[in-house]
């Protein structure tokens, strides 16, 4: 039987080769020529490391040769250095197989297959063999479906594998997300795109860099069926396409983009063309839009060609760049965006200028480069986001019921898998048997989720007391996401770190710790131990600046070689002797740590530093030597407003450094556990003053209004070396009093979750104000809302009024896990909306539909509503507190 299977496989392969052996991957000769030219340029850029040897394989078919050339012509450096050619060939053959075996394979246009099926890379994730693994699981599940229904089915499969959970910025590979059983939206959408492409369905990740009306961003998926692109929420199956919880927020968006692998010649607006991808703008698919032209002039009124023009949205208390253009010879550039406000920041040669642009109201804007570092200014800016204009497809009650039934089954499948992760009891017993710290081990193994066996195996190899202590410390130094996907050989490698510093803290954080920035962890210490001579190691340890000079001389920096990818591994940089600046910095720190020299990338400023007993020494590769920065102090006075006594970094204010080019670089302070009210605040950072490099900065503050608008202020600051700069941190206020915006019957009944009794809101809450929330269990907008409320637990408990949280039905109540939101105020009452309170709110407040959740109102027993929020809103807790403090 096995021999027959092998013979069948060989026959299938021979038939496939015969069918496409001499066929072209690119039938357009002119496009094929352009790809060949781009490929030759890529090869010329990377002469070292023997990175393209797979193309010398004489057995490659014409199709495979061209497909490989297409991939290598445009793939970022990390994909060339960190994955062998055989990996890319395997994926080409897997995509061919899907095209042959799936019923829609022959109907996919060549250009869509080339750009949206063949490429393995979706965004900046780590690559893996997901295409092969997923195809085996999905092929029989979708092969008898229409293309439209297959897209829906693949998303149901993804929901079996993962649900939403926020995490850090490093993007997990698709298989790591499946192993973990959750991921943030960027990881869920990467998973879904990978799964769709595995069965030959064109798919792409759509990303709004920042929402205009709330402090967050989001990613979802578009898939192609029957001649058009449809959108869907990844791992959030709906009965139909073009439906998701984000329909309404997306209609308020100002920019939606996707990165298309290679040179793409589609119909969408092109934002930029880079050596690795074409960035397109798909905002027209989601919201009403308008075009605007920007003219940049100097102070004499002359057009400025090749000026950098950044289109910025207020989000997370900074003006974040969502699109960058350069002016033409006439000093002009343009953008299509949603009908709201952006800040346009133009710069060239150290001069800069800025102005607000209201898309839909202004067709043209002139920005004058009338400022430079050192100028003093304070500017108030009122930002208005686009209005909501969502169009939702119809879903029948039968479709909704069937979808809900399937979601419940999928939840049970995923939960059964998660139930096989190690339990706390088993983790503690393991720690006891191996003489390890029980509390630490239990926390680590539970955090590792599907990767716990790797972590446990590593722990079994810790034999001595010192190694046990050091090994646990190593696991505590790396991130929670690292625990979920790190390999055993990586952990073993870094446990063998050289000890050259007597400072134990430096050794733990800046030598043994494998984590430098946002890179995937690799066993680079063993690698460097093999490729760097003993004599060079001794020289670099004695004089680390010699190592700086070597890197500056031997590692070529190309800012465009790795766009759209994670950092190149240290091993990859060594092989190619080429890197983007960030990968070069990680390479240097990794190289230093491999020799026992403490080094880091400063989290706030992004500067590379050597760590000595005398402090941090900045590394300057351009000067190839020490660069001791001149420092000063910045302090700010703050007069509390009624609803805010201690502004938070990223929520209410940020600080950015003005670069020599005239643009802004955010100081990236630790966010802390923001869900629990952590992170940097005015009192911890600026009340007594903080040390900064001397130079010019911009302080941005902003008050987010319930409407989504912002009252912002920008203030320029100059920090002098050895001096102290004092400024004011001003939170602008909306002086209008809280207004009655609707009515709601406080005698409305609900069923209490505890006891199952029907009770009116008046009975449950007593006379006065109260909050009612209608929840969408396990939906991302509701999860965000509950975490926001948890972060302001103390304020809401101090207020003392009841928060009635209602589930739409008993089934939804059964899915809710109170332990996931243990930080909610003690004034919460849970219930079930058996009397359709949601419909009453929707009708009275003129909301569009009741199934867009969550819905929150603040009302009183005189039946007056003073606050309403529906759907996706970041900072809900703060908005609630701001409103109740104004009552």
Regions found by a protein language model. Name each.
Residues 818-853:
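Short, internal strand/loop/helix patches
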Residues 851-870:
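A short, hydrophobic beta-strand/beta-hairpin element that forms part of a small beta-sheet core
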Residues 299-318, 339-341, 543-546, 641-672, ...:
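Short, ordered, surface-exposed loop/turn motifs in non-cytosolic proteins
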Residues 27-183, 216, 401, 410-576, ...:
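Secondary-structure boundary elements
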Residues 226, 328-344, 348-351, 357-360, ...:
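Short Pro-Gly-centered beta-turn/loop motif in secreted/extracellular proteins
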Residues 760-789, 802-806:
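Short active-site neighborhood of thiol/selenol oxidoreductases, capturing the structured segment around
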Residues 350-372, 704-732:
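Structured interaction patches on ligand/partner-binding surfaces of diverse proteins
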Residues 25, 136, 140-145, 150-156, ...:
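Hydrophobic/aromatic-rich core segments of domains that either
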């Amino acid at each position: 039987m096995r021999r027959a299977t092998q013979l069948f496989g060989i026959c299938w392969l021979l038939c496939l080769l015969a069918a496409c052996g001499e066929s072209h991957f690119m039938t357009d000769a002119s496009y094929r020529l352009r790809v060949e030219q781009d490929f030759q340029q890529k090869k010329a850029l990377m002469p070292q490391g023997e990175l393209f040897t797979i193309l010398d394989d004489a057995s490659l078919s014409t199709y495979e040769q061209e497909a490989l050339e297409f991939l290598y012509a445009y793939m970022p450096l990390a994909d060339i250095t960190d994955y062998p050619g055989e990996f890319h060939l395997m994926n080409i053959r897997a995509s061919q197989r899907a095209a042959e075996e799936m019923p829609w394979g022959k109907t996919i246009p060549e250009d869509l297959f080339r750009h949206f099926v063949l490429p393995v890379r979706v965004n900046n994730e780590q690559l893996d063999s997901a295409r092969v693994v997923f195809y085996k699981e999905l092929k029989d599940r979708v092969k008898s479906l229409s293309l439209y229904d297959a897209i829906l089915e693949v998303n149901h499969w993804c929901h079996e594998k993962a649900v939403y959970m926020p995490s850090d910025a490093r993007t997990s590979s698709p298989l790591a997300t499946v192993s973990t059983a959750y991921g943030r939206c960027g990881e869920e959408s990467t998973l879904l795109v990978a799964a769709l492409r595995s069965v030959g369905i064109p798919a792409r990740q759509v990303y709004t860099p920042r929402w205009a009306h709330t402090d967050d961003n989001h990613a979802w998926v578009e898939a192609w069926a029957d001649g058009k692109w449809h959108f869907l929420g990844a791992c959030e199956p709906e009965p139909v396409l073009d439906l998701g919880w984000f329909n309404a927020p997306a209609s308020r968006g100002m920019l939606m983009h996707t990165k298309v692998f290679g040179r793409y010649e589609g119909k969408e607006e092109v934002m930029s063309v880079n050596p690795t991808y074409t960035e397109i703008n798909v905002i027209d698919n989601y919201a009403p839009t308008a075009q605007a032209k920007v003219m940049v002039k100097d102070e004499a009124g002359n057009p400025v060609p090749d000026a950098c023009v950044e289109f910025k949205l207020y989000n997370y208390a900074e003006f974040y760049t969502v699109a960058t253009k350069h002016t033409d010879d006439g000093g002009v550039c343009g953008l299509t965006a949603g009908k709201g406000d952006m800040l346009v920041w133009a710069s060239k040669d150290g001069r800069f200028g800025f102005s607000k642009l209201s898309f839909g109201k202004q067709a043209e804007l002139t920005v004058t480069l009338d400022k430079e570092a050192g100028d003093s200014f304070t500017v108030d800016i009122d930002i208005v986001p686009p209005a909501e204009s969502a169009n939702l497809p119809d879903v029948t009650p039968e479709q909704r019921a069937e979808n809900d039934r399937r979601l419940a089954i999928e939840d049970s499948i995923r939960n059964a898998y998660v139930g096989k992760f190690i339990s706390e009891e088993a983790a503690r017993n393991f720690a006891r048997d191996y003489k390890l710290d029980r509390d630490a081990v239990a926390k680590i193994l539970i955090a590792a989720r599907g990767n716990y066996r790797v972590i446990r195996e590593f722990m079994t190899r810790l034999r001595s007391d010192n190694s046990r202590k050091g090994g646990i410390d190593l696991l505590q130094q790396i991130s929670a996401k690292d625990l979920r996907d790190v390999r055993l050989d990586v952990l073993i490698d870094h446990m063998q770190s050289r000890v050259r510093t007597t400072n134990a803290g430096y050794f733990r954080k800046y030598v043994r710790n494998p984590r430098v920035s946002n890179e995937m962890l690799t066993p680079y210490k063993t690698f460097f131990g093999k490729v760097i001579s003993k004599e060079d190691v001794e020289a670099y340890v004695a004089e680390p600046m010699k190592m700086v000079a070597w890197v500056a001389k031997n590692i070529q920096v190309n800012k465009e070689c790795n766009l759209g990818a994670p950092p190149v591994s240290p091993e990859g940089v060594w092989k190619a002797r080429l890197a983007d600046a960030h990968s070069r910095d990680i390479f240097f720190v990794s190289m230093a740590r491999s020799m026992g020299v403490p080094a880091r990338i400063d989290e706030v400023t992004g500067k590379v530093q050597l760590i000595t007993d005398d402090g941090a020494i900045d590394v300057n590769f351009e000067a190839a030597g020490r660069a001791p920065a001149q420092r000063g102090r910045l302090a700010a006075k703050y007069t509390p407003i009624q609803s805010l006594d201690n502004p938070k970094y990223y929520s209410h204010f940020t600080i950015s450094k003005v670069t020599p080019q005239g643009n802004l670089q955010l100081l990236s302070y630790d966010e802390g556990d923001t869900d629990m009210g952590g992170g940097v605040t005015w009192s911890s950072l600026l009340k007594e003053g903080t040390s900064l490099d001397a130079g010019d900065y911009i302080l941005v503050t902003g008050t987010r209004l319930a409407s989504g608008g912002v009252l912002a202020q920008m203030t320029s600051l100059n920090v002098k070396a050895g001096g102290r700069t004092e400024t004011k941190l001003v939170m602008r206020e909306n002086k209008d009093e809280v207004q009655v915006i609707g009515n709601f019957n406080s005698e409305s009944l609900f069923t209490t979750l505890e006891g199952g009794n029907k009770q009116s809101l008046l009975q449950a809450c007593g006379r006065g104000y109260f909050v009612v929330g209608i929840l969408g269990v396990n939906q991302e907008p509701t999860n965000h809302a509950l975490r926001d409320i948890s972060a302001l637990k103390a304020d809401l408990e101090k207020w003392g009024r009841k928060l009635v949280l209602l589930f739409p039905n008993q089934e939804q109540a059964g899915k809710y896990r109170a332990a996931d939101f243990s930080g909610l105020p003690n004034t919460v009452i849970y219930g079930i909306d058996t009397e359709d309170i949601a419909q009453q709110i929707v009708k009275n407040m003129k909301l569009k539909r009741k199934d867009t959740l969550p819905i929150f109102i603040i009302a009183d027993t005189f039946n007056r509503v003073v606050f309403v929020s529906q759907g996706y809103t970041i900072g809900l807790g703060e908005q609630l507190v701001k409103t109740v403090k104004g009552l």
